[in-house]
Amino acid sequence: MTVRVRIAPSPTGNLHIGTARTAVFNWLFARHTGGTFILRVEDTDLERSKAEYTENIQSGLQWLGLNWDEGPFFQTQRLDHYRKAIQQLLDQGLAYRCYCTSEELEQMREAQKAKNQAPRYDNRHRNLTPDQEQALRAEGRQPVIRFRIDDDRQIVWQDQIRGQVVWQGSDLGGDMVIARASENPEEAFGQPLYNLAVVVDDIDMAITHVIRGEDHIANTAKQILLYEALGGAVPTFAHTPLILNQEGKKLSKRDGVTSIDDFRAMGFLPQAIANYMCLLGWTPPDSTQEIFTLAEAAEQFSLERVNKAGAKFDWQKLDWINSQYLHALPAAELVPLLIPHLEAGGHQVDPDRDQAWLVGLATLIGPSLTRLTDAATESQLLFGDRLELKEDGQKQLAVEGAKAVLEAALTFSQNTPELTLDEAKGEINRLTKELGLKKGVVMKSLRAGLMGTVQGPDLLQSWLLLQQKGWATTRLTQAIAAE
């Protein structure tokens, strides 16, 4: 048997981290087994589905490195398949027309609530006679289509993550709606609904394994009945744990960040997000391993090692993983990733003219980055010819010998336009010896004169970057003139 799995998002919003994590697990399982990973867009909610969300979902999956083998398939392009299946169920007596109005259904729920009963449809239109149906139609009522659910039926499946799951038919809320009422009196029924469409798609696409969130367990019980009724093979199910916030509640928009776009804007690399999502519910065979590519994770992946318990989202862990990927990037590859964040922080750069300088900057600040958004802050002291003296810098310039260091460094900078690291290091050693100062005094004074503070990135590399831009001499001049 060739494994066939699918990720089936609804384009009613941008790619959510929960959907992305489900996509990661499906992708890993498909690659581990040599199977097929299918993208299916469940866009039957015509009011909320939008083309821009469809595009966002696809681009988000691609950004994460989750390439699909088949698709994307769109449910709105398969409506005939669903209508055919609904008609089949009607012809077999497994589905029927229900003419209940929304007011009647609300009255039903209120009566059940008053008796402390769980809300459910009471199946009152299950066995209407043709005359009763005709009378209801004469009132102008348009029917929904409901699928018969046997309250006595016990639905059992062996979940690949949760073990045996048992669901009682009486707990499914009564006969379920599988098609809306049509606004057109000439049509037998309206828009097919989620549970029916999903099952028809899975049968037509020969899906062998359905890997999705545990919030779909009730849907699975309903869908198993539909697979059987339509004569399709029931796939193997695996229900993954929910992603939780630090309080142990389901991660939601109230937590501030939920879409992949949000994480991207916050400066996370796709490799880091994909890596972290692997660990949100799955434990590698080597539980100490935390950094791996998707391909490396796929070699080890199994559903048996996916946890049942909810996976708490850990920002510190994600930050650490992201920093590992950032620190491993060659400076030349880091540069194009930094530029948007440098510009967002108010630093203007010319990638063509400043390429070598930017590589030097990336080399300098790269090891201190946790997120790409840190770039503007980490490089703050290295842009512009204006010296902003902080309090610690002013104090350092008042130390005996500090101004002599700056004057000598200014002369040296003016005479050495093509400064190298070795030359900068040699000048510091020369000043230490000739001025009779401690090396720490020389370095702190020079740092204060170049960057306005005694704290900051590596002094020698910073001096080179400022010298290459012509900012070193300007800043040193300002520092010497400072009172």
Swiss-Prot record:
UniProt-annotated binding residues for ATP? K253
Q: What is its EC number?
A: 6.1.1.17
Q: Provide the Gene Ontology terms for cellular component.
A: cytosol
Instruction: Name the residue ranges of motif: 'KMSKS' region.
Output: 250-254
Top-level taxon: Bacteria
Q: Where is this motif: 'HIGH' region?
A: 9-19
EC main group? ligase
Question: What does it catalyze?
Answer: tRNA(Glu) + L-glutamate + ATP = L-glutamyl-tRNA(Glu) + AMP + diphosphate
Q: Which GO terms describe its molecular function?
A: ATP binding; glutamate-tRNA ligase activity; tRNA binding; zinc ion binding
Q: Which CDD domains match?
A: GluRS_core
Q: Return the SUPFAM superfamilies for the record.
A: An anticodon-binding domain of class I aminoacyl-tRNA synthetases (SSF48163), Nucleotidylyl transferase (SSF52374)
Q: Where in the cell is it found?
A: Cytoplasm
Per the record, the GO terms for biological process are: glutamyl-tRNA aminoacylation
The alphabetical list of record keywords is: Aminoacyl-tRNA synthetase, ATP-binding, Cytoplasm, Ligase, Nucleotide-binding, Protein biosynthesis
Q: Which InterPro entries match?
A: aa-tRNA-synth_I_cd-bd, aa-tRNA-synth_I_codon-bd_sub2, aa-tRNA-synth_I_CS, aa_tRNA-synth_I_cd-bd_sf, Glu-tRNA-ligase_bac/mito, Glu-tRNA-synth_I_codon-bd_sub1, Glu/Gln-tRNA-synth, Glu/Gln-tRNA-synth_Ib_cat-dom
Q: Which NCBIfam families match?
A: gltX_bact (TIGR00464), PRK05710.1-4 (NF004315)
| Similarity-based family | Belongs to the class-I aminoacyl-tRNA synthetase family. Glutamate--tRNA ligase type 1 subfamily.
Query: What is said about its interaction partners and assembly?
Result: Monomer.
What does this chain do?
Answer: Catalyzes the attachment of glutamate to tRNA(Glu) in a two-step reaction: glutamate is first activated by ATP to form Glu-AMP and then transferred to the acceptor end of tRNA(Glu).
Q: Which PANTHER family match?
A: GLUTAMATE--TRNA LIGASE, GLUTAMATE--TRNA LIGASE, MITOCHONDRIAL-RELATED
Protein name as it appears in the record: Glutamate--tRNA ligase
Q: Could you tell me which species this protein originates from? A: Synechocystis sp. (strain ATCC 27184 / PCC 6803 / Kazusa)
**The organism's taxonomic lineage, starting at the top:** Bacteria, Bacillati, Cyanobacteriota, Cyanophyceae, Synechococcales
